[in-house]
Amino acid sequence: MGFLTTIVACFITFAILIHSSKAQNSPQDYLNPHNAARRQVGVGPMTWDNRLAAYAQNYANQRIGDCGMIHSHGPYGENLAAAFPQLNAAGAVKMWVDEKRFYDYNSNSCVGGVCGHYTQVVWRNSVRLGCARVRSNNGWFFITCNYDPPGNFIGQRPFGDLEEQPFDSKLELPTDV
C-alpha cells in the first residue's frame, strides 16, 4: 500500500507542476498585466487573438536554436524578451512595463533609457494581442508578443490626447531587442 501511495503522490505532484507551469503562461497571464498597465494610463483593454498567438508561436519556434533577440519584421507590433534560467508571461510583461520610468509624456520621448517596449504595451490603437514562449536549446526562455494594429509610430503618442505634439528624436525604439 505504501508503494501505491507514493506513486499516486508523485503523479499528483507532477500534474500540479505541469498545470502551474502552463498557468503561468496562459493567454490571461499575458493579457492581465498588459491590461493593468493600459488601465493606469486610461487605455482600453486588449483581447487575445489566436491568429497573433499562432504567428508568435511560429516565430518563437524559429528562435529555439539560438534564442536570438531578433525581430520578425512582420506586419505586427512586437516585443521580445529572453532570460535564464526562467521567464514567464508576467516576468516578460513586467520587464516591458518597467520601462515606463523612461517615458516622458510631455516630450513624447524616452529619457535615460529605452521605453519602446512600454509604449507598445500601452499603445491605444493596439487592441489585439498574441504571445508565445519557448525554451531554447541553450536553456534560455524566449517570449514574443505581437500587437495588432502595431504601435510606436513616430510623431504619435501611445495614449492620451489625440492632438499630437511634434516627435522628439530622443525616443529610442528597439531595433534589436
From Swiss-Prot:
Domain SCP: from-to ranges: 31-147
Sorted UniProt keywords: Disulfide bond, Pathogenesis-related protein, Plant defense, Pyrrolidone carboxylic acid, Signal
Gene3D superfamilies, per the entry: CAP
Modified residues (Pyrrolidone carboxylic acid): Q24
Record-level GO cellular component terms: extracellular space
GO biological process, one term: defense response
A Pfam family per the record: CAP
Signal peptide: 1-23
General function of this protein: Probably involved in the defense reaction of plants against pathogens.
Family of this protein: Belongs to the CRISP family.
Protein name listed in UniProt: Basic form of pathogenesis-related protein 1
Taxonomic placement: Eukaryota, Viridiplantae, Streptophyta, Embryophyta, Tracheophyta
